[in-house]
Amino acid sequence: MSAFHLETLKSLPKAEQEAALSEANRQLEEMSAEDRLKWAFDNLSGQFVLSSSFGIQAAVMLHLVTRKKADIPVILTDTGYLFPETYRFIDALTEKLDLNLQVFRAALSPAWQEARYGKLWEQGVEGIERYNDINKVEPMNRALKTLEAGTWFAGLRRDQSKSRSHLPILAIQRGVFKFLPIIDWDNRKIHYYLKEHDLPYHPLWDEGYLSVGDTHTTRKWEEGMSEEETRFFGLKRECGLHEG
């Protein structure tokens, strides 16, 4: 597999671009997560960044990637509505792993947003999507541009939701390479990795949370619920960062 140059690949006719990505993904599927990362650093172009929501199992990707590239920028899009436990978790992991944390926020503060728009998360799917655009999508786009990203690592997994079940390891999204090295991991593998490397779950894991985002759109898991139903009142799974 030869090196991938983003601008060259983006300039190809769509069919050729898809064929090149498909062949790369076919080979990447046979590799371990560690080997996938090595391949990415050896073959993908541009600056590398890693995004993290500092969710329940976030320590896995943070540890896995920073072992390969200690100073990689770690992007957090901070809505201002994260759980207190999440902010403390961010502080703890940043210190433990010596993270190069880069925090991006919306142009308007949470209080100003509420004054202007009301509580967008209480305004149905349209309100949630507008909230996500303001607090997640725009700050992430700005982060990718500011950090001159060419390759974006993320910790999405196929077993997390239906919307992620067919995602490839390598794609082009938002004009950069999107690379998902643990896409085929399950909860068991995640658990063993955390234990092997003495890494913590998010503190709310012990209180019954399977997924953690903002305080106003996150629910504890209850019997009969899917993980998807614990976020955004079950109306949608994605916060916008990993769509489109």
From Swiss-Prot:
It holds the Pfam family PAPS_reduct. The active site is at C239. One of its GO terms (molecular function) is phosphoadenylyl-sulfate reductase (thioredoxin) activity. GO terms for cellular component: cytoplasm. It is found in: Cytoplasm. Catalyzes the formation of sulfite from phosphoadenosine 5'-phosphosulfate (PAPS) using thioredoxin as an electron donor. Belongs to the PAPS reductase family. CysH subfamily. This is Phosphoadenosine 5'-phosphosulfate reductase. It comes from Zymomonas mobilis subsp. mobilis (strain ATCC 31821 / ZM4 / CP4).
